[in-house]
Design a protein with these regions (language model features):
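N-terminal strand-loop element at the rim of the active site
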Residues: 7-11, 23-68, 169
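Carbohydrate-associated surface elements
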Residues: 154, 175
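A short helix/loop element that forms part of the nucleotide-sugar donor recognition site in Leloir-type
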Residues: 182-195, 341
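Conserved donor-binding/catalytic core segment of Leloir-type glycosyltransferases
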Residues: 195-211, 217-220
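Aromatic "clamp/platform" in nucleotide-sugar-dependent glycosyltransferases that forms part
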Residues: 262, 281
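Short hydrophobic beta-strand element within catalytic cores of glycosyltransferases
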Residues: 298-301, 311
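Conserved acidic donor-binding segment of nucleotide-sugar-dependent glycosyltransferases
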Residues: 313-314, 318-325, 334-339
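A short, well-ordered alpha-helix in the C-terminal region of glycosyltransferases
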Residues: 327, 334, 341-356, 362-368
Length: 388
């Protein structure tokens, strides 16, 4: 198949999943065309079967804000027409689904087929999409898509609850390359980060308010108060970082906390972790804890959103009530001080990630879904030209 993929190319879960999906599809013989305003950050180089088409937005004095959605639509039409795309898969509803639906409709006027699959990732539904400025457009774009997927059952239900959706939403979870994400021998790195015998707690996020990184620091403070020698490694960057840095100083634990900034890949850091801690207020899936689990790291996470789908049944960690610092600290201390429990959880984490979320099994689900959507579209529009 010749597949177009549009995503936000910046640091974030939806962009990571879209890029990794494209790369995996390319290795399976499909021709992949990324359409975005810059090269996706995990697409370090364009390789065989992978092409990149940059969306340029011209600035005119008349426009206070550059009309990116329209420029994206035009680029989608251009790529679909001249690269003979079989399908366009957009990640994150705003504005990608809207642009894709418009591009499809433009091509239909020329008797050309371009089935559109929209994947919902989280804040495009739970936060941004419910803003009154966007809600009607998001609702229309989802209903007008030829196929819709969500990354968790939680997000699927949230979409039905928040919008007037008339189409079926298929759940295809996020995935990782479990050969790539595995525990590495990094004792030299560990010795450079912490003293012998110290425990290593890791948190990875974009430091936005919803991630509650300040709660991570407060939980870690409780861990230290229990006499546990430990280091906290904070990976990522974002608007709350300066506030979190100040909190570590206010609590007097700044020397036990390392801010590592954006790191890609993160498996070297996860390979020295004893525990992964996530205190988010909302997570549609939980890609960061999945990466930790694949590296054999027990997890302690908020009992919110799609996280229970990932953690429950895995025997790889604990879920805690949102905002309950004491409960989080108790769970973390239990994992860090019980060696046999830690070893069992680490083993279960790796096994569960490989069994349920490996690239090969999930990408196969997307391939099957693409074929279904292409076939259905062709049957519904027999006079439309299907690319050969």
């Amino acid at each position: 198949m010749r597949i177009g993929i549009t995503c936000y190319p910046v640091y974030g879960g939806s962009g990571v999943v879209a890029t990794e999906l494209g790369r995996a599809l390319a290795t399976r013989g499909h021709e992949i065309h990324f359409i975005a305003y810059s090269l996706p950050f995990r697409l370090s180089k364009v390789t065989e079967n992978i092409y990149f088409h940059e969306v340029s937005v011209n600035r005119y004095p008349l426009f206070d804000f550059p009309p990116y959605a329209l420029s994206l639509t035009s680029k989608m039409v251009d790529v679909a027409k001249y690269e003979a795309l079989d399908l366009l898969h957009v990640h994150y509803a705003i504005p990608h689904a809207t642009s894709a639906v418009l591009a499809r409709d433009i091509l239909e006027k020329e008797s050309r087929s371009l089935p559109v699959v929209t994947t919902l990732h989280g804040t495009d539904i739970t936060i941004v999409g419910q803003d009154a400025s966007y809600s009607p457009v998001v609702n229309y774009s989802i209903n007008a898509s030829d196929g819709v997927t969500a990354v968790s059952n939680f997000l699927r239900q949230e979409t039905y609850d928040a919008f007037d959706i008339e189409v079926p939403i298929k759940v295809i979870p996020n995935f990782i390359d479990t050969e790539h994400f595995r525990r590495l021998e990094k004792e030299h790195f560990r010795s450079a980060i912490c003293a012998p015998g110290q425990k290593v707690v890791v948190h990875v996020s974009n430091f936005r308010r919803v991630k509650n990184v300040s709660h991570v620091v407060e939980v870690f403070h409780r861990i230290l108060q229990e006499g546990i020698s430990a280091k906290l490694l904070l990976v990522g960057d974002g608007p709350d970082r300066s506030n979190v840095e100040q909190l570590t100083r206010d609590l007097g634990i700044q020397r036990a906390v390392r801010f590592l900034g954006k790191q890609d890949p993160v498996q070297e850091i996860l390979s020295i972790a004893d525990l992964f801690l996530l205190t988010s207020g909302s997570e549609s899936f939980g890609l960061a804890p999945l990466e930790a689990m694949a590296c054999g790291v027990p997890v302690v996470c908020s009992d919110v959103g799609g996280l229970p789908e990932l953690v429950e049944g895995s025997e790889a960690g604990f879920l805690c009530p949102l905002g309950d610092i004491q409960a989080f600290a108790k769970a973390c201390i239990k994992v860090l001080t019980n060696d046999s429990l830690h070893a069992e959880m680490a083993q279960h984490a790796r096994e569960y990630a490989v069994r349920h979320y490996d690239t090969h099994s999930i990408v196969a689900q997307y391939e099957e879904y693409y074929e279904e959507i292409i076939g259905r579209t062709a049957a519904q529009n027999p006079k439309i030209i299907v690319p050969e």
